[in-house]
Amino acid sequence: MTALLELCNVSRSYPSGEEQVAVLKDISLQIHAGEMVAIVGVSGSGKSTLMNILGCLDKPTSGTYRVAGRDVSTLDPDALAQLRREHFGFIFQRYHLLSHLTAAQNVEIPAVYAGIERKKRQARARELLLRLGLSDRVDYPPSQLSGGQQQRVSIARALMNGGQVILADEPTGALDSHSGEEVMAILRQLRDRGHTVIIVTHDPLIAAQAERIIEIHDGKIVHNPPAQEKKREQGVDAAVVNTAPGWRQFASSFREALSMAWLAMAANKMRTLLTMLGIIIGIASVVSIVVVGDAAKQMVLADIRAMGTNTIDIHPGKDFGDDNPQYRQALKYDDLVAIQKQPWVNSATPSVSKSLRLRYGNIDIAVNANGVSGDYFNVYGMSFREGNTFNAVQQQDRAQVVVLDANTRRQLFPNKANVVGEVVLVGNMPVIVIGVAEEKPSMYGNSNLLQVWLPYSTMSDRIMGQSWLNSITVRVKDGVDSDQAEQQLTRLLTLRHGKKDFFTWNMDSVLKTAEKTTYTLQLFLTLVAVISLVVGGIGVMNIMLVSVTERTREIGIRMAVGARASDVLQQFLIEAVLVCLVGGALGISLSMFIAFMLQLFLPGWEIGFSLTALASAFLCSTFTGILFGWLPARNAARLDPVDALARE
């Protein structure tokens, strides 16, 4: 008769300081299919070590161990996990049920790692619990089950994948006599159904119920009667086999790992929430800074554009502050006409200005009077609250008309509904008000100077008596590169003047400088927020490391029922990523609340959440979970199942 399990000259020793302590010494043993064997011995005799080797939880230091003819020493860790999963079922003295799972979910664990479809394994788990008399306790957690009921759940778990070999370590040690008898009766029934049952015990009454008693003392077998071949009534229950394609097995495995991770998180809600807190704050900081910073940047750029978008100013001289008399009259009206003819020019306006007194009735105020063309307001993107700008005829006739700014209107006409047609004195010249320009808010604040605008011909001839222009402002057409336009403008005027007696000021350079400055500031603040996210990630790693330590026995149980190192790695990594993703979602919600509150207090700000910001937050959460969850997950996957099961 060929042995199902065969040990040949097996020894097992462990390092103790600089020495090796032998626990098993030259063990040779054969166990046949369908036997019920008891391994007895006092504490420290090596019987538990022998059981670990039989169950492929441990490997011998020397000698050969074969399972159904396969040499275990030739198998890698994944193959050993498969062997445990498909051939062995473990029953422990302390049951080793996972407290956050129900009875049925505990029974399903081996089938989860075997890749069995959910419906099939749920049906099998309920069938096994029904057979063991626990049909009314299927959805109960272990804390609501008696010791005997918990051990029956443990037996059902051992049978989930078929359980060809049942390894029972002191199965009645924690039970009362009645429950112990029930468990032993179940084990005998399993023996009768063709299962190979190996009981490790120090109780002679339990051992006496086995067909064969193997006694071990000080690491050596001192009594080993020959096996007795018996005919069994039935064969071993066939395990449920997974026939799904590879990609479906992977998807199922990932889904189950996600489900187990969620259950583990739900079992420690407060700790999970505190772990998430750092991620919530970090993600909220990053997202808030990105969206609020973007809103602030757009507001700054809008204010700059309000000063004149896509405009180029031309001034006489070499630079600002140059009052050399030879350059004072550099810009002429003919220059303006030549500029207006260029195909890339949208509009152009001259400018002459002087500080004057403005009077209406008994009100006398100081204003800055500007001589401009009718295109001035188009160049600077200004709209009218009342009336309109001056036309070409008024400019040609040097008409005595004026446009007021909103502040000047309030000073002169605080109680009038419409001021168009009113006559005021600019200097000593009476002029008719034809419009009120809408004031535009600026990031630099509003000037304390009151502004009025007259036709430049009126200003030059009637008030100032000069034929040259103080400056020209050009608005470039949309789509035209302002730098190229500036170069062409410089070339045009240099050719006309025969020299470069002017300088230009491109508002786009101000815009680009502001964009660069706001981007730098936003980047700096984002880096500060990322630091808080990193701190949150370190918190996740710290808690996950603690979790691995606290759940060491759970890891050992999972490995005993067939989990591979990669399964354990996947589960703990998914837990870390899930914590970070949920924390990220809450962080995004918090940032939306912050944005909502800011808009209540800062109504002018347009805060919006782009898909880019949300996708970035999602990726940050995922990356943080992977980065800071890797070390704890790797530590969990590297645990030795024997050491893990021995931890309290």
UniProtKB/Swiss-Prot annotation:
One of its GO terms (molecular function) is ATP hydrolysis activity. GO terms for cellular component: plasma membrane. Pfam families: ABC_tran (PF00005), FtsX (PF02687), MacB_PCD (PF12704). ATP binds at G41, V42, S43, G44, S45, G46, K47, S48. It is a multi-pass membrane protein. SMART domains: AAA. Its EC number is 7.6.2.-. Disulfide bonds: none annotated. Keywords: Antibiotic resistance, ATP-binding, Cell inner membrane, Cell membrane, Membrane, Nucleotide-binding, Translocase, Transmembrane, Transmembrane helix, Transport. Residues 5-243 form the ABC transporter domain. The chain crosses the membrane at residues 273-293, 417-437, 523-543, 577-597, 611-631. It is found in: Cell inner membrane. InterPro entries: AAA+_ATPase (IPR003593), ABC3_permease_C (IPR003838), ABC_transporter-like_ATP-bd (IPR003439), ABC_transporter-like_CS (IPR017871), MacB-like_ATP-bd (IPR017911), MacB_PCD (IPR025857), Macrolide_Exporter_MacB (IPR050250), P-loop_NTPase (IPR027417). GO terms for biological process: response to antibiotic. Coiled coil: none annotated. Belongs to the ABC transporter superfamily. Macrolide exporter (TC 3.A.1.122) family. Part of the tripartite efflux system MacAB-TolC. MacB is a non-canonical ABC transporter that contains transmembrane domains (TMD), which form a pore in the inner membrane, and an ATP-binding domain (NBD), which is responsible for energy generation. Confers resistance against macrolides. Homodimer. Part of the tripartite efflux system MacAB-TolC, which is composed of an inner membrane transporter, MacB, a periplasmic membrane fusion protein, MacA, and an outer membrane component, TolC. The complex forms a large protein conduit and can translocate molecules across both the inner and outer membranes. Interacts with MacA. PANTHER family: MACROLIDE EXPORT ATP-BINDING_PERMEASE PROTEIN MACB, MEMBRANE COMPONENT OF TRANSPORTER-RELATED. This is Macrolide export ATP-binding/permease protein MacB.
